């Protein structure tokens, strides 16, 4: 018995067995098989700006917001505007799997647990043994624009967005409006590693 992958190679199975009403297929050689997980690769640093050129500002005491900020102010607040973007190897093809973190004394990583955006005090994990995580977002290029969007791996169809709430522009997680929703589009300006 064999199973075909997308590349045309196959996996030969030597045995099948039922354990607790679950069918297990035992391959002859599982050296080429990958488990469903995210494995951390390397990182880059960037400033994230909204479609209105506002800079993402992370203050651990408050929800992340977008602010009008000249470069001199952004540089003065670099620990709160410099995002550390860790890239992850993904066992599925869904976009570039990333985490977003800031280091202002201690490392904090963006989470969308329960669809609420917050930076949790933690280092991005080396490995995540699942295909979904509140920490992983799929960074994708927006067709026809020089912009990026970030889809939650945990909540399919939900994206990071810049949304006005009260008197502030906040970073939120929302379902993307398919009619040209620009609130989910961001500009990334890569910075030199420090």
Curated annotation (Swiss-Prot):
<dbReference type="GO" id="GO:0120162">
    <property type="term" value="P:positive regulation of cold-induced thermogenesis"/>
</dbReference>
<dbReference type="GO" id="GO:2000256">
    <property type="term" value="P:positive regulation of male germ cell proliferation"/>
</dbReference>
<dbReference type="GO" id="GO:0032967">
    <property type="term" value="P:positive regulation of collagen biosynthetic process"/>
</dbReference>
<dbReference type="GO" id="GO:0032740">
    <property type="term" value="P:positive regulation of interleukin-17 production"/>
</dbReference>
<dbReference type="InterPro" id="IPR015529">
    <property type="entry name" value="IL-18"/>
</dbReference>
<dbReference type="GO" id="GO:0043065">
    <property type="term" value="P:positive regulation of apoptotic process"/>
</dbReference>
<dbReference type="GO" id="GO:0007611">
    <property type="term" value="P:learning or memory"/>
</dbReference>
<dbReference type="GO" id="GO:0042267">
    <property type="term" value="P:natural killer cell mediated cytotoxicity"/>
</dbReference>
<dbReference type="GO" id="GO:0010744">
    <property type="term" value="P:positive regulation of macrophage derived foam cell differentiation"/>
</dbReference>
<dbReference type="GO" id="GO:0006954">
    <property type="term" value="P:inflammatory response"/>
</dbReference>
<dbReference type="GO" id="GO:0043434">
    <property type="term" value="P:response to peptide hormone"/>
</dbReference>
<keyword id="KW-0964">Secreted</keyword>
<dbReference type="GO" id="GO:0032731">
    <property type="term" value="P:positive regulation of interleukin-1 beta production"/>
</dbReference>
<keyword id="KW-0395">Inflammatory response</keyword>
<dbReference type="GO" id="GO:0045515">
    <property type="term" value="F:interleukin-18 receptor binding"/>
</dbReference>
<dbReference type="GO" id="GO:0045944">
    <property type="term" value="P:positive regulation of transcription by RNA polymerase II"/>
</dbReference>
<dbReference type="GO" id="GO:0071375">
    <property type="term" value="P:cellular response to peptide hormone stimulus"/>
</dbReference>
<dbReference type="GO" id="GO:0032757">
    <property type="term" value="P:positive regulation of interleukin-8 production"/>
</dbReference>
<dbReference type="GO" id="GO:0042632">
    <property type="term" value="P:cholesterol homeostasis"/>
</dbReference>
<dbReference type="GO" id="GO:0045662">
    <property type="term" value="P:negative regulation of myoblast differentiation"/>
</dbReference>
<dbReference type="Pfam" id="PF00340">
    <property type="entry name" value="IL1"/>
</dbReference>
<dbReference type="GO" id="GO:0070328">
    <property type="term" value="P:triglyceride homeostasis"/>
</dbReference>
<dbReference type="GO" id="GO:0001666">
    <property type="term" value="P:response to hypoxia"/>
</dbReference>
<dbReference type="GO" id="GO:0043525">
    <property type="term" value="P:positive regulation of neuron apoptotic process"/>
</dbReference>
<dbReference type="GO" id="GO:0030324">
    <property type="term" value="P:lung development"/>
</dbReference>
<comment type="subunit">
    <text>Forms a ternary complex with ligand-binding receptor subunit IL18R1 and signaling receptor subunit IL18RAP at the plasma membrane. Mature IL18 first binds to IL18R1 forming a low affinity binary complex, which then interacts with IL18RAP to form a high affinity ternary complex that signals inside the cell. Interacts with cargo receptor TMED10; the interaction mediates the translocation from the cytoplasm into the ERGIC (endoplasmic reticulum-Golgi intermediate compartment) and thereby secretion.</text>
</comment>
<dbReference type="GO" id="GO:0030431">
    <property type="term" value="P:sleep"/>
</dbReference>
<dbReference type="InterPro" id="IPR008996">
    <property type="entry name" value="IL1/FGF"/>
</dbReference>
<dbReference type="GO" id="GO:0035655">
    <property type="term" value="P:interleukin-18-mediated signaling pathway"/>
</dbReference>
<dbReference type="GO" id="GO:0071320">
    <property type="term" value="P:cellular response to cAMP"/>
</dbReference>
<dbReference type="GO" id="GO:0010628">
    <property type="term" value="P:positive regulation of gene expression"/>
</dbReference>
<dbReference type="GO" id="GO:0032725">
    <property type="term" value="P:positive regulation of granulocyte macrophage colony-stimulating factor production"/>
</dbReference>
<dbReference type="GO" id="GO:0051092">
    <property type="term" value="P:positive regulation of NF-kappaB transcription factor activity"/>
</dbReference>
<dbReference type="GO" id="GO:0008283">
    <property type="term" value="P:cell population proliferation"/>
</dbReference>
<dbReference type="GO" id="GO:0042119">
    <property type="term" value="P:neutrophil activation"/>
</dbReference>
<dbReference type="GO" id="GO:0019221">
    <property type="term" value="P:cytokine-mediated signaling pathway"/>
</dbReference>
<dbReference type="GO" id="GO:0016324">
    <property type="term" value="C:apical plasma membrane"/>
</dbReference>
<comment type="function">
    <text>Pro-inflammatory cytokine primarily involved in epithelial barrier repair, polarized T-helper 1 (Th1) cell and natural killer (NK) cell immune responses. Upon binding to IL18R1 and IL18RAP, forms a signaling ternary complex which activates NF-kappa-B, triggering synthesis of inflammatory mediators. Synergizes with IL12/interleukin-12 to induce IFNG synthesis from T-helper 1 (Th1) cells and natural killer (NK) cells.</text>
</comment>
<dbReference type="GO" id="GO:0008284">
    <property type="term" value="P:positive regulation of cell population proliferation"/>
</dbReference>
<dbReference type="GO" id="GO:2000556">
    <property type="term" value="P:positive regulation of T-helper 1 cell cytokine production"/>
</dbReference>
<dbReference type="GO" id="GO:0014911">
    <property type="term" value="P:positive regulation of smooth muscle cell migration"/>
</dbReference>
<dbReference type="GO" id="GO:0071260">
    <property type="term" value="P:cellular response to mechanical stimulus"/>
</dbReference>
